[in-house]
Design a protein with these regions (language model features):
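Generic structural detector for well-ordered beta-strands
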Residues: 105, 119, 131, 143-145, ...
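N-terminal, positively charged, Ser/Thr/Ala/Gly-biased leader segments
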Residues: 1-21, 118, 135-136, 141-156
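A glycine-rich beta-to-alpha transition motif near the start of alpha/beta enzyme domains, typified by
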Residues: 1-112, 163-279
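Membrane helix-loop-helix hairpins that form the core translocation module of multi-pass transporters
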Residues: 115-117, 121-123
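Short, charged/polar, Gly/Pro-enriched secondary-structure boundary elements
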Residues: 124-128
Length: 279
């Protein structure tokens, strides 16, 4: 079975051609392939499939085998994958995800895709739709205590749940420990991704992310979008900013006119290979 390892801002996934026959148990396949000691090593797998009403459809599985709604960085890499491999000649694509239809614009240079912009859609602020177990309609700067640490959280869904926390000095905190506790907190019936954000300026935000089902990763596209939305809601940032992640930078814009969030960043092919292991 052929695979392609790709990364966007350090968010690395294994990409599989779903137009060809694949193993039935994709959850187990993701656990095996994603293992960084006994497999290829990745944040998960992404399967590119035919769609009845879009150019392509994606399914993605985290490293622990759980299926996720979508991933912004992965959607950019899908744009590069399908164009560079000749599955399409279009530079504007529609992508079907469990979080709805996403629109991709490909920046092609010398016959290959270098950067991709994604229309990530409208942010969801309604607490029941994120979802969050609360009687409140929205969670904006909501006080939450985690092991004697008091945080103010803002919850946003970009098709998947995110909890954003603003910190002045990230290095003071054990983000792995705190991230895991918040991910599994009773407030979040479907668990949550957790973003830790430090405001460098209204146009530059530093972010680290604890991803649901994976742990800390170098980047998260939907998390970067949710972080900018949360920063704007809390009066900490402009509607267009650069998000500085461990794996690289993403340009994020929350458009005031149409309420949609746009993400732009690189998409990189790391290597390709053949997977011969049984699941």
């Amino acid at each position: 079975m052929r695979f392609t390892k790709m990364q966007g801002a350090g968010n690395d996934y294994i990409y599989l051609n779903g137009f060809e026959k694949l193993p039935a148990d994709l959850s187990a396949l993701s656990r095996r392939m994603s293992d960084r000691h006994f497999g290829i090593g990745a944040d998960g797998i992404v399967v590119i499939m035919p769609s009845d009403h879009c150019d392509f459809r994606m399914r993605m599985f985290n490293a622990d085998g759980t299926e996720a709604e979508m991933c912004g960085n992965a959607s950019r890499c899908i744009g590069k994958y399908v164009y560079d491999k000749g599955l399409t000649s279009k530079t504007q694509l529609t992508l079907e995800t469990l979080a709805g239809i996403k629109h991709l614009i490909l920046d092609v240079k010398n016959g290959t895709v270098s950067r991709v912009s994604v229309d990530m859609g409208n942010p969801i602020l309604s607490a029941p739709k994120i979802p969050v177990n609360t009687s409140l309609s929205e969670i904006i700067s909501y006080p939450l205590e985690i092991e004697n640490n008091k945080f103010n959280i803002t919850c946003v869904s970009m098709g998947n749940p995110h909890t954003v926390i603003f910190l002045n000095e990230m290095e003071r905190y054990d983000l792995h420990h705190i991230g895991a506790l918040i991910e599994h907190h009773e407030l979040f019936p479907k668990r949550t991704n957790v973003e830790f954000v430090e405001i460098l300026s209204p146009d530059h935000l530093k972010m680290r992310v604890w991803e649901r089902g994976t742990g800390e990763t170098l980047a998260c596209g939907t998390g970067a979008c949710a972080s900018l939305v949360a920063a704007v809601l809390n009066g900490k940032a402009n509607r267009k900013a650069v998000l500085h992640l461990l794996g690289g930078n993403l340009d994020i814009e929350w458009n005031e006119k149409n309420d949609r969030v746009y993400m732009t960043g690189e998409a990189v092919t790391v290597f390709e290979g053949e997977w011969n292991n049984n699941i």
